Every structure is written in structure tokens, then in C-alpha cells.
Amino acid sequence: MAYAKLGRDSAARKALLRDLATDLIINERIETTEAKAKELRSVVEKMITLGKRGDLHARRQAAAFIRREVADEETGQDAIQKLFSDIAPRYEDRQGGYTRVLKVGPRRGDGAPMAIIELV
């Protein structure tokens, strides 16, 4: 299976993708480097597909990957609940392609190519 190493060992890479996936589910739009955005795209697509399936096993698989962070302060909803109750129903008729990666130019400090990844 081909994937980007992102300059990290496997545990750090998995932790990074978990954090970014959780942030994208909560905020629905984040800015990161192009390589991270492209790698994150496949992870988030799989999570949304699990959300669309909606059964207990899918919920547990998503919970094993996504961090338990509060998505909405007022309702107390966490990221997993948001994925299954808000985001997944939105894409019920769509077969994949839930995210969009937009290139935004180089980062000021080190010139790294930046991108915005958002839910369509």
C-alpha cells in the first residue's frame, strides 16, 4: 500500500492523522501542508463511509481512530457523534469524494506548500 511517510515513524504518523482527522470532523475545514492534506483525504473518506454505514461495528471502528474531543460546547456533542449524526447523513447520496483539497501557496516561514482541506 502506498502512503506518504510525512517524515515520521509509523506511530507518530498515525497520531498525526488521528489528530488532523478529528480536527477536520469538528471544524469541517483546516489548513495544513499539501502532503498532509492529501494523506488525510483518504483517512477522512473512510471515516465518513463508516459514518454512512451507521451500525454498531462501524461506530466502534470510528471510535477506535477518532479522538474523543468535544465538537460542540453547547450540546456536549463529541467528534464521533458529529460524524454519525451530522456529517454522514449529508453525504447519503454521494459515493465518495467527500473532501476537497485547495492549494493556497507556500508557508511564510519555510516555504512549505500549504493547502486547505474541507468537507464538500
Curated annotation (Swiss-Prot):
PANTHER family: LARGE RIBOSOMAL SUBUNIT PROTEIN BL17M, RIBOSOMAL PROTEIN L17. Keywords: Ribonucleoprotein, Ribosomal protein. GO terms for molecular function: structural constituent of ribosome. Belongs to the bacterial ribosomal protein bL17 family. Pfam families: Ribosomal_L17. GO terms for cellular component: cytosolic large ribosomal subunit. NCBIfam families: L17. The gene is rplQ. HAMAP family: Ribosomal_bL17 (MF_01368). It comes from Halalkalibacterium halodurans (strain ATCC BAA-125 / DSM 18197 / FERM 7344 / JCM 9153 / C-125). The keyword Secreted does not apply. This is Large ribosomal subunit protein bL17. GO terms for biological process: translation. Part of the 50S ribosomal subunit. Contacts protein L32. The keyword Hydrolase does not apply. It comes from the Bacteria.
